[in-house]
Design a protein with these regions (language model features):
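Intrinsically disordered, low-complexity proline-rich regions
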Residues: 1, 25-26
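Bacterial N-terminal signal peptides that target proteins for export
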Residues: 1-11
Length: 474
């Protein structure tokens, strides 16, 4: 595995070679349905592997074409809520590790929200936009009888054509007339972008460089990132990498934005850690009326509930309730004529030093103070304790240091309290559950989690294995 020092040097070289984004216009010319079926895990939905064919007319007078894979999941039988989500598929694996497998793409919007999208009637598409991936695997999957990852095969002329590919995905959801099946998706009214880590860096680049001037996207859910933009250039093999961002918009003249950040994202994005970017402290945008940022305590960049890595100590904090609520709030903020703003931003307590390193204030358990406090960390509400931690959650995992594995490093750790400490904290299950209820009720009432997740958190607390071993209610 490559060391952080080598990655910092490589990143610096890539940033030095980066080109300014090119203003382009694109057109979808056709859509091919490669496979279509009823979704196994989404009742009333069709899952389709498709290929999107498009042309690009660039500002420099040149023209190009792209042929990229996508996964489209759409509701049947009038179940649609007329909102689409474009998942900016994450291919960071191929920028950090040798391409020993095709299965290094991650549809993090699905991983982070579970069945929520399909319970609520959203239309979903994830699309490949990273030229580095299509250059590795080529235009089409081999016909060899083996399983292949549809999302890695395609062709992109220029790396910066990515922006129009991503805009075209939104356009396709709003106008699916080129879809060749008469039972295809219905048009949506509102389209949200959703990116996680690498995808989130691309979203920040789109906003910082004004690459969606006509607001094809109606809103952006930007997850697990610091101030680091994913750049596009035509230098192989990466065709761009994380780099410094231009100033983010501050005046609200952009589609609404919700940013989700974790303890990891406050500290890993720095030249001395991952080798690029700045802390998520610098993506805070408190004067912009169209920007919210929620910083989630006790959560790592890659927690086990979203992406289990098979580690003995990976951070077990579950941020998915916050992700689902953020998506619901962004929908209400952007859909229809009667729109509702999301809850206020929630920041960690702390500051940055002279080197732009975030220095957090921590609680008695070592979790970052402030922010959105799910029941797995402690808080105080109206002078009473809320939340019931079962151990210490950290943002970084030392197992990822030698040899350096960035995925492991940013997965964080969890160390459970001893039985003696748990009994001292919660002499009875009733006391434990009351504290979870207090935290969950507070978060739900203020819109930071949904009511469905409030009930699920309470139900889980009632059956959490505790040293006193009281029976789980039926």
């Amino acid at each position: 595995m490559t060391s952080p020092t080598v990655w910092r040097a490589a990143t610096g070289a890539l940033m030095a070679l980066a080109l300014a984004p090119i203003s382009v216009e694109a057109t979808i010319t056709s859509v091919t349905v490669n496979a279509s079926r009823s979704c196994e895990n989404a009742a009333g939905y069709t899952c389709a592997d498709i290929t999107v064919h498009g042309s690009v007319a660039r500002a420099d007078g040149s023209a190009g074409v792209y042929v990229v894979p996508a996964v489209l999941i759409y509701p049947r039988h009038h179940r649609a809520n007329r909102v689409g989500v474009v998942d900016w598929v994450n291919s960071a694996f191929f920028h950090f590790f040798p391409p020993t497998t095709e299965f290094g793409t991650f549809q993090f919007t699905l991983l982070a929200t579970g069945h929520y999208l399909f319970d609520e009637g959203y239309t979903y598409v994830s699309i490949q936009w990273d030229k580095a991936v299509t250059e590795i695997f080529g235009p089409t999957a081999p016909v060899d009888g083996l399983p292949h990852n549809h999302l890695v095969y395609g062709s992109i002329d220029r790396s910066a054509d990515a922006w129009e590919i991503l805009l075209d995905a939104a356009r396709l959801l709003k106008d699916p007339s080129l879809y060749p099946d008469s039972n295809g998706p219905r048009p949506v009214e509102t389209v949200l972008s959703s990116g996680y880590s690498q995808g989130a860096g691309a979203q920040l680049e789109l906003l910082a460089e004004g690459l969606d001037p006509h607001l094809v996207y109606d809103g952006h859910l930007i997850q697990m990132i610091g101030l680091a933009c994913f750049k596009r250039d035509d230098v192989a093999p990466h065709f761009g990498f994380f780099g410094d961002c231009s100033p983010l918009p501050r005046n609200g003249r952009h589609a609404p934005v919700i940013v989700l950040a974790t303890e990891s994202d406050m500290v890993i994005f720095h030249p001395t850690v991952l080798g690029f970017g700045k802390s998520a402290f610098f993506t805070r945008n408190p004067t912009d009326p169209n920007w919210r940022q929620y910083e989630i305590a006790g959560i790592s960049h890659l927690p086990e509930p979203i992406l289990p890595l098979g580690l003995p100590n990976q951070n077990t904090g579950d941020p998915r309730p916050v992700f689902r609520a953020a998506l619901e709030n962004l929908t209400r903020w952007t859909k229809g004529t009667h729109r509702a703003g999301p809850p206020p931003s929630r920041y960690f307590s702390g500051s940055v030093d002279a080197n732009d390193v975030f220095v957090p204030v921590t609680d008695a358990d070592g979790h970052f103070a402030g922010g959105v406090r799910l029941p797995h960390v402690e808080s105080t509400l109206h002078g009473r304790p809320a939340g019931a931690p079962l151990g210490r959650h950290t943002p970084l995992n030392p197992l990822g240091l030698d040899p350096f594995n960035p995925f492991v490093f940013i997965s964080g750790t969890f160390t459970r309290f001893s039985d003696e400490e748990l009994l001292e904290r919660y002499p009875s299950r009733d006391q434990y559950v009351r504290r979870v209820v207090r935290a969950a009720d507070h978060l739900s009432a203020r819109g930071y989690i949904t009511n469905a997740d409030r009930m699920a958190l309470i139900a889980a607390a009632e059956c959490e294995p505790l040293p006193e071993d009281s029976p789980c209610p039926k």
